[in-house]
Amino acid sequence: MDIYDDKGLQTIKLFNNEFDCIRNDIRELFKHVTDSDSIQLPMEDNSDIIENIRKILYRRLKNVECVDIDSTITFMKYDPNDDNKRTCSNWVPLTNNYMEYCLVIYLETPICGGKIKLYHPTGNIKSDKDIMFAKTLDFKSKKVLTGRKTIAVLDISVSYNRSMTTIHYNDDVDIDIHTDKNGKELCYCYITIDDHYLVDVETIGVIVNRSGKCLLVNNHLGIGIVKDKRISDSFGDVCMDTIFDFSEARELFSLTNDDNRNIAWDTDKLDDDTDIWTPVTEDDYKFLSRLVLYAKSQSDTVFDYYVLTGDTEPPTVFIFKVTRFYFNMPK
């Protein structure tokens, strides 16, 4: 379960079994602790435990720029009927793309009671699973009635990538749209072509994945969504198949970028084995419509130029004005 605040920052993250790979290693650290309800143990920053936690958080959190983990692990033990008061928070994030968290990893789960209670503005949350929650939230450990609860607690700091905007996908998901390609799998390119006697379509939109494959999204005045799945191996193929005004173009010349650039990605980081995402559901098509409209509204202020040269004599130069937005589709 993921819960966000009104600024779009994650405040609660419930985990399933992601930390099973290190749970026994953490238990081993504290196996000799018998006479203390709480103890802190410094770790090396590059310890396997810290590194594995960092990898899990990068994988499970969305839109992350940086994860910092305090190398001190706090071990806490709760016996039946220990009285635990509500812990009040007065921590306030300094920026709208940064949050500090407590990560709680269960080492021993009580038979009854002992859940963590989080006081959230939209309703209180109780959990006896591994959980990460923002330090902006008040919390309380409920009384253990039967058995014992032992947990490991770590301080986590997360910086998130700043999104350009967020586009509604469905009732449960909004998709962050970025101008930064790092960590993204797809790029929507809204393309305007300089007037040229060989050009038939002057505005077009394609989604380009990490392999360089292109899915035609729109080609009618920049707003009509193409419903049939038209996939090309490269943007050069899109030009030959859609943009140019005559079918013999492939036979007359080929296209290259003089800087060996891909229209969306760093060429040296292309992954040829990646299949391109294609729309299937009504939510997919509605999202694309919203994305195209947003890109069109930004195309006069957020853009770059991309040039392809045809090997004619003299060379034929095609100049494309490109607005790029990077994103990931929900899994």
Curated annotation (Swiss-Prot):
State the source organism's domain of life: Viruses
Q: Which InterPro entries match?
A: Poxvirus_C4/C10 (IPR005004)
Family that this chain belongs to:
Belongs to the poxviridae C4/C10 protein family.
Spell out the protein name for this chain.
Protein C10
- Native organism: Vaccinia virus (strain Western Reserve) (VACV)
